[in-house]
Amino acid sequence: MAQSSPQLDIQVLHDLRQRFPEIPEGVVSQCMLQNNNNLEACCRALSQESSKYLYMEYHSPDDNRMNRNRLLHINLGIHSPSSYHPGDGAQLNGGRTLVHSSSDGHIDPQHAAGKQLICLVQEPHSAPAVVAATPNYNPFFMNEQNRSAATPPSQPPQQPSSMQTGMNPSAMQGPSPPPPPPSYMHIPRYSTNPITVTVSQNLPSGQTVPRALQILPQIPSNLYGSPGSIYIRQTSQSSSGRQTPQSTPWQSSPQGPVPHYSQRPLPVYPHQQNYQPSQYSPKQQQIPQSAYHSPPPSQCPSPFSSPQHQVQPSQLGHIFMPPSPSTTPPHPYQQGPPSYQKQGSHSVAYLPYTASSLSKGSMKKIEITVEPSQRPGTAINRSPSPISNQPSPRNQHSLYTATTPPSSSPSRGISSQPKPPFSVNPVYITYTQPTGPSCTPSPSPRVIPNPTTVFKITVGRATTENLLNLVDQEERSAAPEPIQPISVIPGSGGEKGSHKYQRSSSSGSDDYAYTQALLLHQRARMERLAKQLKLEKEELERLKSEVNGMEHDLMQRRLRRVSCTTAIPTPEEMTRLRSMNRQLQINVDCTLKEVDLLQSRGNFDPKAMNNFYDNIEPGPVVPPKPSKKDSSDPCTIERKARRISVTSKVQADIHDTQAAAADEHRTGSTQSPRTQPRDEDYEGAPWNCDSCTFLNHPALNRCEQCEMPRYT
């Protein structure tokens, strides 16, 4: 990364960092060095470079192999606060630097100008990690056989990559010799533990067996610059097309202070058959028993090849590496190729961290699992592998990072190698941090307060939903990344010659990313519209059924109303009406016969009985008193008439007349005992009023009803 040197003007650097926050500090520092701290020249150059980081497809202008190697450098080193200063950029940022390298071989920041490591993370100038480190201090405290972790192994620096126990030295393949060892200045404050993880892509896609890469951090020195670095590289398939790019315009200074002793990287145990024996020392057979055991060779069918290390997306791999004591932003949006990490509204929090959490007993483990690929994604969800000793970052962290862009994508400026049959798609990494107790800082670096902790990082393919969530997070961030078509960006992305690949050649990948994002957006919109259309169709069908039901009910009501007015009676109804009519006629005939029978018996006049009270005079006219022999006859006749009328109302046949006659005969028989002396006979017989015919008590002289006198 870019180190602060006396040639840099801190004020100009600060102004440029404020003006171009999307450009990493290393690139800004290199621009200042090239332009001799000229603010205007740096502004012009950085304004041209800013779009590369805005559209997140940065590549070196002379890098004609942008699809081949995408180096992801995960820095796990620790540093002391005294060595931290703002000019160091990502070198002293707590060891969490993601580095984009255009080099093709092993990581060699000083081997050639084109192999400089470009800072990918722009770290804020916050409180650095507080670590008390010694020159020979190994932060991972992992012992080899009969050798302490703090003792530097006696390995000559002529081997840039050395395998330890568990490697099969004859399993390496590839003719490319190791690059010359880099020269670094030794700063004893740093304890470097390099972990170079290179995963191979040129594996047959039919293999689905899980493979594991075990990395044992037992060497307290670093080959590649920053302390405790982990480099994850994806390179192309053909080694014939390996080219060393020319000097990049933004060259960075050496990665970090590295001691010259023990130039051995951490061991890699993939148990495969494609290694370079020239790059790995067979004498490192000193750790037969390690803290972690890799699976047998049958389960690890060569996931890695030495010259070009790429991972097949459809296969599963495991990488075990120790954690770093620093923290990372929770949701930064970053992509690997542009060497740019968007800070947005998130800031990197540096939490105080002491070496006590990295003591021997507290050996922590990070497990990186590469899952089978689901679909080509345009961004990866990368989460922080390092941890902090505070419980604040124990939740799920998600970063969106894109490594190598798909080599099968259109308008990609590649001329020196054939296109692979599959595309190198971004990797989707999720990080789950265990919920164990946090390490308590202690003054002694050897004190262990917590047991072994395992950190799992799952590497898979980014799905559509992940990109949608990424867009949602970008909407909530301070500076969302614009997506513009290729027509907006100057230069054509379809150029095939590497000499034409200037700054504007990133427009091809921009156009591809824009196309992918547009397709994803349109697909999501189409799905949403299809769902809405389905709901509308269901609602339409429901309304149609309701309308049909209402129309049917209306028709039924109309039919019932019409049938009530003009309906022809049924034969049953006609028969019923005919029988009722016949019954009425029978009743009328019976009534007439009864009337004729009663009329033939005497002075029974129904008309006179109905109008009886109309013939009564209004005044107290006393009728002439009837004779004694006829006095009883009217009463008897009247009683008979009353009884006959009542009987005729109840019975409606001819036999009623016989019953009436029998009743009349019975009445005559009942009147015969009344003639016998009873109590009433002593008082006298009741008398009928001549005016109102009311039957009065014999003791009364006036009528009880009309007050007419009994006798005139």
Swiss-Prot record:
Coiled-coil boundaries: 517-559
Positions of modified residues (N-acetylalanine): 2
Statement: the UniProt record of this protein carries the keyword Zinc-finger: yes
Modified residues annotated as Phosphothreonine in this record: 404
Biased composition (Low complexity): 233-249, 269-290, 405-417
Outcome when changing residue 649 to R: Almost complete loss of AMFR-induced 'Lys-27'-linked ubiquitination
Organism: Homo sapiens (Human)
UniProt biased composition (Pro residues): 322-332
Post-translational modification: Ubiquitinated; following IL1 stimulation or TRAF6 overexpression. Ubiquitinated by AMFR via 'Lys-27'-linked polyubiquitination; leading to TAK1/MAP3K7 activation. Degraded in a lysosome-dependent manner following interaction with TRIM38.
Protein's name according to its UniProt entry: TGF-beta-activated kinase 1 and MAP3K7-binding protein 3
Claim: Coiled coil is one of the keywords in the record: yes
Name of the encoding gene: TAB3
Annotated CUE domain residues: 8-51
